[in-house]
Structures are given as structure tokens and as C-alpha cells.
From Swiss-Prot:
Protein name: Quinolinate synthase
Cofactor annotation comment: Binds 1 [4Fe-4S] cluster per subunit.
Reaction equations catalysed: iminosuccinate + dihydroxyacetone phosphate = quinolinate + phosphate + 2 H2O + H(+)
Similarity section: Belongs to the quinolinate synthase family. Type 3 subfamily.
Pathway(s) the chain acts in: Cofactor biosynthesis; NAD(+) biosynthesis; quinolinate from iminoaspartate: step 1/1
Subcellular localization, as worded in the UniProt entry: Cytoplasm
Binding-site list for [4Fe-4S] cluster: 110, 235, 325
UniProt keyword Zinc, yes or no: no
InterPro entries membership: NadA, NadA_sf, Quinolinate_synth_A_type3
EC number(s) per entry: 2.5.1.72
Residues given in the record as iminosuccinate binding sites: 47, 64, 144-146, 165, 261-263, 278
Length: 375
């Protein structure tokens, strides 16, 4: 379990009272002042799904893969991560011992990461041992970075690696070449899309593993025949997109380009013209010709920012409803200002500190990912 400084939880109530009444102009000025005082001792990392009034203060912005690389390379003493819990954990795992990682809101979690806990994973591995004789020799565990530090540690200890939506293809290919089977968790949709669309593994060689059922809900024979075991997890945002939404856009605008994130269901990715990570989505649309129209299947803050940054194009969400990552949205300018001004005063609040034993094993999985992906 990740350790959060106990005093940060109590101080949070004071933060709400002290900062809630400030205008956005006051907050912007105070954040800028705090950043100037901290100088090179500080780096603020901002995920693409953060709201505009937070991400504008980031020194570096990116997707989970890019920010993992940034966290590994930065020389700053303080890493303030405007993202969600598992991202801050990864920054702490990859960072130096003398670096401090801070998450402005310690309740900013990830429902997908919560769908795979370490106790369930250990039970699943025991079942695979029972069925296959030696899970270690037969199954390569691969975890999406959207997972807890404890899950990453388990994967690292058992020879596996992490992946992101940017590098899932080379990681899954690596796993396939080393062991006859792989266990991909916690996002079944990214695993299925990568294995099927990128590596050509037949869908009938994949099983969705329900960790709440014995043997994942399958017979031992079916498990022995399978090549890819997909953990029954998903992203609550990307699961909201539907193939019917894409068809509706095409009926209204036959010229529309559809680009979606691989966390969407296979039905959605099959209907799209382009599929890729947030970094891929941004690059593709930024480089698209003026006058083009795009329907984007990812979190609404990024979709809106793409339209703002590309006024010569028409950019809409695939969904008729706002698909918002509510946990990303928990981080606001008030909390960012609070943690920065505390740092100026020499106080560290909301530190994310992964226990050493977990950190060492989890680093194996993250370092393997970076090595395989070329960073």
C-alpha cells in the first residue's frame, strides 16, 4: 500500500477554507509567484486530461507514458503531479530517493486501477499455477500503468512489464515472444485491441478473466487453449463511447474523421479511422489539414483543448454526452496553489511515497517497459 503523509489529510480541510474563496486571477498570480520562488527545485507535470486552469501551470504535459519518461529524467527536488494516484506512484518509483512526489488531491484515484488489487492477482496466479503446472514459465504478466504500485511490483517480480497506450504494441509483442501466454491487466480493451489489431492474435484465443470467479469463469481446458488472458477491467470514461455514436456522426457528416483511444471497446475501435494514445490523437489532429472535421473518442477536457488549439478545424466528441474523468477533475487550482505555497514555506503535504520493498520490484516492471520501448 502507498503511504501518504498522515498530516496531509488533516491539513486538507484548512486548505478548502483558506483557498476556496480566491478568484482564478488571484490563484494564477499566487501559483506563478510560488513557482518563481521554488525555481528549478520544482517541476509540475500535467496529464492531458487535466482541466485547462490546472494544466496551463504545468512545466511539462503529456500522456502517462510521456510523463513517466519526464519523471524519470527530471532533476527537480519536488515533482508535483497533476494527474491521478497511480501516475504519482510511478513518478515516485522511477525518481531518485532525494526527490519528493506530491499529488495535489490525494483522493484523485483511478477506477480502472482499483479493478485489480494485489490480493486478487495473487489468487489468480495461484489458480494459473494449479492449472498450468508452472505459471512463471507459461504466463507473462503485463500491467497497464493504470494500476497500483503493488500490482506493478508483482508483475516486475514475475518477469513482466508495464505498458501504456503509447507502447502497448512492442510490450505485448515482447511478451508473446517470451512465453506462450500472457495475462494482461487491468484494461481488457487495450489488451484486446493490441493483441488482435496489432499482433493478429485471434479473438477466440483470448479469454476475459473475471477475478471474482473460480478460474476466471472458465474451464481449465479453455485456459490451456488460450493465448491471452484479459483481466475484466475497463476505463469508466472510454467505456461510454458506442459504435452507434460514430455511425450517427458519419450519417450527418460523411467527411468526418474518427479518432479514438484504444481503451474504447473493440466495437468502437473497429468503426474508427484512427486509434491511438492521447499523444497520437493530439499529433494527428494538430497535423491535419485546415477545414477537416474530427470526432474524438477520449476524455472531454482533451477534446475541448484540441478545438481551442486548432480553431481552423472542427473537433467534436464522439459521444453526445460529456465524458469526463471525474477523478482527474478533483485536482483544481486551489489545491495546486495550496501545495506550492506549502513547499515555499518548507512544508510537504500530500506526498506520495511508495514503500521501498514495493518500489524496488515495481521499478523492474517500469524499467523493462522503458527499455523495450526505447527510452
Amino acid at each position: 500500500m502507498t503511504v501518504i503523509a498522515a498530516e496531509a489529510i488533516g491539513v486538507a480541510h484548512e486548505r478548502a477554507e483558506d483557498y476556496a474563496g480566491l478568484s482564478i486571477e488571484e490563484l494564477d498570480q499566487r501559483i506563478a509567484t510560488a513557482k518563481a520562488k521554488l525555481g528549478e527545485r520544482l517541476v509540475i507535470l500535467g496529464h492531458h486530461y487535466q482541466r485547462d486552469d490546472v494544466v496551463k501551470h504545468a512545466d511539462l504535459s503529456g500522456d502517462s507514458y510521456g510523463l513517466s519518461v519526464d519523471a524519470r529524467k527530471t532533476a527537480a527536488e519536488y515533482i508535483v503531479f497533476c494527474g491521478v494516484h497511480f501516475m504519482a506512484e510511478s513518478a515516485d518509483i522511477l525518481g531518485r530517493d532525494d526527490q519528493t512526489v506530491i499529488l495535489p488531491d490525494h483522493t484523485a484515484g483511478c477506477s480502472m486501477a482499483d479493478m485489480a488489487d494485489i490480493e486478487q492477482l495473487e489468487e489468480v496466479w495461484d489458480e494459473l499455477d494449479e492449472i498450468l503446472g508452472d505459471a512463471e514459465a507459461q504466463v507473462m504478466p503485463i500491467t497497464y500503468v493504470n494500476s497500483s504500485a503493488a500490482v506493478k511490483a508483482f508483475v516486475g517480480e514475475h518477469g513482466g512489464a508495464c505498458c501504456t497506450s503509447s507502447n502497448a504494441e512492442p510490450i505485448v509483442r515482447w511478451a508473446k515472444n517470451l512465453r506462450p501466454k500472457m495475462l494482461f491487466l487491468p484494461d481488457q480493451h487495450l489488451g484486446r485491441y493490441t493483441a488482435f489489431a496489432k499482433l493478429g492474435i485471434p479473438l477466440d484465443k483470448m479469454l476475459v478473466w473475471n477475478p471474482n470467479l473460480r478460474y476466471g469463469g472458465h474451464t481449465p481446458e479453455a485456459i490451456r487453449e488460450a493465448e491471452v488472458l484479459l483481466w475484466a477491467g475497463h476505463c469508466s470514461v472510454h467505456a461510454q463511447f458506442r459504435p452507434a455514436y460514430i455511425k450517427a456522426w458519419r450519417e450527418k457528416h460523411p467527411e468526418i474523421n474518427v479518432i479514438v483511444h484504444p481503451e474504447c471497446t473493440l466495437g468502437v475501435t473497429n468503426e474508427a479511422d484512427y486509434v491511438g494514445s492521447t499523444a497520437y490523437i493530439i499529433k494527428t489532429i494538430n497535423e491535419a489539414p485546415a477545414g477537416s472535421m474530427w470526432a474524438v473518442g477520449t476524455e472531454i477536457n482533451l477534446v475541448n483543448r484540441l478545438q481551442t488549439n486548432n480553431p481552423d478545424k472542427t473537433i467534436v466528441s464522439v459521444s453526445p454526452f460529456a465524458c469526463l474523468c471525474s477523478t482527474m477533475y478533483r485536482i483544481d487550482p486551489e489545491e495546486l496553489c495550496w501545495v506550492l505555497e506549502n513547499l515555499v514555506e518548507g512544508n510537504v503535504v500530500n506526498q506520495i511515497a511508495v514503500p521501498t520493498a514495493i518500489k524496488q520490484k515495481a521499478r523492474l516492471a517500469l524499467e523493462r517497459m522503458l527499455e523495450i520501448a526505447g527510452n
